[in-house]
């Protein structure tokens, strides 16, 4: 596949988001609809209250449009392409519902935890059923141990993987530009892996995500003019997990998505420590807030986290290809 196709995919996603995002921002500002900031969050985040959210709506549309037209042009609209777009839309719709409730109620509480979990599980179950129908391998590739056939247990693993990483990306989305940058690195890494495996349809999807997120980053870096919302973070997390599954390099996501893993682990450790000992390990979790409390700027945290994520992604890609 030529560099022309790579470039067309990246540029298409970028231009759609870059050109249309100002209109979406103006729409939300005109309606005075913006993100409500959690009271228990860092006090200096209160100035972000009212910033338009649900920017994920536009980059999801850009990803879909780009994947469809480039995939159609290159005859790469295969079943796995539709699976990826389905997960992106379903998890995005769940986040849209959550964000809409927050905007309507003018508070930072949307769907109840069980409602969000139910939606995530339903989406994951549908993915596993389609996966099984396509006779894709129900096996897990474990570095150093080879490929392990899990049979029906692979479906349970896939469900946990999708739900876990969609929530992990959602937890990480607490600083301007952090998730947009890290997700760009992760999807870029999987684009390279997909290319090496001749899975060009998955590669095109990943490149569409990268281009769209770069367009979004123009408006999401500090100081953010718009947030991606749960709509964006849940969709990205679900799609990222689905990509790792369809490329049969599931566990590589632990390294390629190491920042999402660290952020989630910090929350789990914080809660467990407080429940067991009454003491907190971090000044605040997720861990990016801990560094904020230590006096780090958002830009410094972003750059350090992106650097860690980039190094981890390069190592992972190098060991796979």
Curated annotation (Swiss-Prot):
Pathway: Cell wall biogenesis; peptidoglycan biosynthesis. It is an enzyme of class 2 (transferase). GO terms for biological process: cell division; cell wall organization; peptidoglycan biosynthetic process; regulation of cell shape. Pfam families: Glycos_transf_4, MraY_sig1. CDD domains: GT_MraY. Its cofactor is Mg(2+). It is found in: Cell membrane. Keywords: Cell cycle, Cell division, Cell membrane, Cell shape, Cell wall biogenesis/degradation, Magnesium, Membrane, Metal-binding, Peptidoglycan synthesis, Transferase, Transmembrane, Transmembrane helix. The chain crosses the membrane at residues 1-21, 53-73, 77-97, 110-130, 145-165, 174-194, 200-220, 226-248, 301-321. It catalyses: UDP-N-acetyl-alpha-D-muramoyl-L-alanyl-gamma-D-glutamyl-L-lysyl-D-alanyl-D-alanine + di-trans,octa-cis-undecaprenyl phosphate = Mur2Ac(oyl-L-Ala-gamma-D-Glu-L-Lys-D-Ala-D-Ala)-di-trans,octa-cis-undecaprenyl diphosphate + UMP. InterPro entries: Glycosyl_transferase_4 (IPR000715), PNAcMuramoyl-5peptid_Trfase (IPR003524), PNAcMuramoyl-5peptid_Trfase_CS (IPR018480). One of its GO terms (molecular function) is phospho-N-acetylmuramoyl-pentapeptide-transferase activity. It is a multi-pass membrane protein. NCBIfam families: mraY. Catalyzes the initial step of the lipid cycle reactions in the biosynthesis of the cell wall peptidoglycan: transfers peptidoglycan precursor phospho-MurNAc-pentapeptide from UDP-MurNAc-pentapeptide onto the lipid carrier undecaprenyl phosphate, yielding undecaprenyl-pyrophosphoryl-MurNAc-pentapeptide, known as lipid I. This is Phospho-N-acetylmuramoyl-pentapeptide-transferase. It comes from Lactiplantibacillus plantarum (strain ATCC BAA-793 / NCIMB 8826 / WCFS1) (Lactobacillus plantarum).
């Amino acid at each position: 596949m030529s560099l022309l196709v790579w470039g067309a995919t990246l540029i298409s996603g970028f231009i759609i988001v870059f050109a249309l995002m100002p209109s979406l921002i103006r729409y939300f500002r005109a309606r005075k609809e913006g993100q409500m900031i959690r009271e228990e969050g860092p006090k200096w985040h209160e100035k972000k209250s009212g910033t338009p959210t649900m920017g994920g709506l536009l980059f999801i549309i850009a990803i879909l449009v780009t994947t469809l037209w480039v995939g159609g042009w290159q005859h790469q609209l295969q079943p796995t392409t539709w699976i990826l777009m389905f997960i992106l839309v379903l998890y995005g719709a769940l986040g849209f519902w959550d964000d809409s409730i927050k905007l309507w109620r003018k508070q930072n509480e949307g769907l109840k935890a069980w409602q969000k979990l139910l939606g995530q599980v339903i989406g994951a179950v549908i993915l596993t059923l389609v996966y099984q129908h396509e006779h894709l391998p129900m096996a897990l590739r474990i570095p150093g141990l080879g490929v392990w056939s899990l049979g029906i247990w692979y479906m349970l693993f896939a469900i946990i993987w999708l739900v876990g990483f969609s929530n992990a990306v959602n937890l990480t989305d607490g600083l301007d530009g952090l998730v947009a940058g890290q997700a760009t690195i992760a999807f870029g890494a999987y684009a390279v892996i997909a290319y090496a495996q001749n899975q060009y349809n998955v590669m095109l999807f990943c490149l569409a995500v990268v281009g769209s997120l770069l367009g979004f980053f123009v408006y999401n870096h500090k100081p953010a003019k718009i947030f991606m919302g749960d709509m964006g973070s849940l969709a990205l997390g679900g799609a990222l997990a689905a990509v790792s599954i369809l490329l049969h390099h599931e566990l590589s996501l632990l390294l390629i998505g190491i920042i999402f893993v660290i952020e989630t682990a910090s929350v789990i450790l914080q809660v467990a420590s407080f429940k067991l000992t009454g003491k907190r390990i971090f000044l605040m979790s997720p861990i990016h807030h801990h560094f904020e409390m230590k006096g780090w700027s958002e830009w410094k945290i972003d750059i350090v986290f992106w650097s860690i994520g980039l190094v981890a992604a390069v190592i992972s890609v190098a060991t796979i290809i």
